[in-house]
Amino acid sequence: MLNIESNSSVDNKDEEMVNLPSDALRISPDSLTVDGGQRYYLNDNLFTGFSCQYEGDLMIFEIQFQNGLKNGVSRFWHNNGQPKSMLTFKNGAVSGKYKLWDEEGGLVEEGTH
């Protein structure tokens, strides 16, 4: 598995971060279930940690959850390893800074929701 920092040079110094510990649980999205209210569960418990999807050794996305809701910064990568998007979630909804990159790693758009 790759460490998030080794996958790209996504700048996160000004992002609103949820302070999950560096050893927080990291699982495949297939391990989670979701209810109609968009709350995510692991073994019938509200999930706190990271959901990460890989293609081979390359991370495709990393989504933060806190108490079953997307909360904090979520990152997505193009299949070539370049950053694709960074979205900030608060209580399950996109809220805060976002950035979008093209397949060559060039910043296409950034803003705040």
What are the roles of these predicted feature ranges?
Residues 1-113:
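Glycine/tyrosine- and acidic-biased, solvent-exposed loop/turn segments at the edges of beta-strands
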